Regions:
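Glycine-rich flexible loops
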Residues: 1-273
């Protein structure tokens, strides 16, 4: 069967990277059953032949109007699809969609009529914001990192920047590779407009956002970048829990030590692009 990836090496490389990352998510235990979602802007890889492709499934409503997404193309994980299956067969467990001219609906164009994730409105709202701000970020990743979700069950870590402070203090690399810390979104019903709006607000100042008692959403230049930032923060959470399991609250790096790292590496205080 012909695929939209045939003869399009750059697009195939993006899809291959997505498949690689979904394998990591499964291996880490972050993607039970059909848990987690991925959306990547692939518009720049669409040639005239792709743009002329007709819909292969009925038009679906997004549930909101997203004016910056008119005519844009995204690879999306399918609803009910497993990350471990996507790692092997990305175009059977996800699809490429085109946003319609009304900016409020979409259609699947390739390869199979796989309906995107139920959390598509949240993902597309984030993509709309990234385009609105001129960001070079293309990918959104939702997953269930065990240690970070566990910490979200403790109220202390949901107040202010306490979780960011603790995670940064565990190992210098967390501060270096996740310099915007982690945003916190109080519990909201999955796939709800409330959750989408709260996530969008936190993404304005963070590359990774923690949904209380649920999971994380990360944005990045590509899907590997979004994964790496989540992975770095989860490693810090793991270190914290290992130290706690030895019977004491870990000391962590001091404020002075963390500032020294920030100054030495000239770490950004806002999204670099």
């Amino acid at each position: 069967m012909a695929s939209i990836l045939d003869g399009r090496a750059e697009l195939k490389a993006i899809i291959d990277q997505i498949a690689e990352v979904t394998g990591y998510l499964w291996q880490k235990g972050w993607a039970e059953r059909n848990g987690g979602n991925i959306t990547v802007n692939v518009t720049e890889y669409m040639d005239d032949e792709c743009k002329a492709m007709k819909a292969i499934a009925p038009v679906k409503q997004i549930g909101m109007v997203l004016p910056l997404l008119k005519g844009k193309y995204f690879y999306c994980k399918g609803t009910g699809k497993r990350m471990r299956d996507l790692a092997k067969f990305p175009m059977q467990n996800g699809s490429i969609i085109r946003i319609c001219d009304n900016c409020a609906s979409y259609e699947v164009i390739a390869d199979e009529p796989v309906v995107p994730t139920s959390e598509l409105p949240t993902h597309l709202a984030l993509q709309n914001y990234l385009l609105e701000t001129g960001s070079c970020y293309k990918a959104t990743l939702h997953t269930h990192p065990i240690e970070l979700v566990a910490m979200s069950h403790i109220q202390r870590f949901l107040k202010g920047d306490e979780m960011t402070r603790v995670l940064w203090s565990m190992i210098p690399e967390t501060l270096a590779f996740a310099p915007l810390g982690i945003g916190i979104v109080p519990y909201a019903m999955p796939s709800s407009v409330e959750l989408a709006e709260a996530t969008l607000e936190q993404i304005k100042t963070h590359d990774v956002v923690l949904w209380e008692k649920h999971g994380t959403v990360a944005v990045g230049t590509d899907i590997m970048d979004a994964f790496d930032q989540t992975d770095v923060l989860c490693k810090a959470a793991n270190i914290y829990m290992c130290a706690r399991s030895m019977g004491s609250e870990p000391d962590g790096m001091t404020s002075e030590q963390m500032k020294e790292v920030q100054d030495a590496f000239n770490l950004p205080k806002k999204r670099p692009c």
